[in-house]
């Protein structure tokens, strides 16, 4: 960094350098840190960097695919979990030991456990929010899942710290395709595209937090029109959430906070 004296009155930047005024009004010149973008894009010395950048962009796209599959459950989040999903994508990519860096695949179909049990909230994690026994049955051929929910005990199992009078269970099912390095575009792309709108939401009944609700079953299914797009490279992502409700004009209304959700099953 250098201080410029004399008749100069500069701002902005010249290749490799930035000019600005500090808080005392002095003209300052600073050399930009790190290699310039042209070298990163073209120099053989940064080939490995370019490969890692390419994979990172693929992981960013993986995060977008997941958030699309979560649908409205994204609104439950109490933090920006984009970076967490990018990290999961990178962990899955690191499992590919056959292909070289920059060409490694991102196959969720082979590593479903990396995304299962992913929580949408940090403060209100689903398993701590409501401890209920959930028996999940999946039918990939018919794009369907069924969950049986046992009686939750209000005193011991539901953390209702805001004392809401109602709660309900919701399910959403969406699709996430495996990803690969497309040699034509030299970018990471989903193997199966146009799955962004392939989501279905099922909303359960409102139950009082003061009364133990009955044992009940919830079923969720994608329309059969999606079947032709669901190849072996596509994951069906089933997520579950709990929402609390407050009273509005004598009827239950969704509360804007207090709930939580997670990825229940990938099949």
Where are these regions (language model features)?
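Residue-identity detector for glutamine
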Residues: 53, 61, 75, 159, ...
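Intrinsically disordered, low-complexity regions enriched in small/polar residues
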Residues: 10, 19-22, 48, 190, ...
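Long, polar/Ser/Thr-enriched low-complexity segments
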Residues: 1-124
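Charged linear interaction tracts used for macromolecular binding and regulation
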Residues: 93-235, 239-245, 257
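Extracellular fibronectin type III
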Residues: 249-267
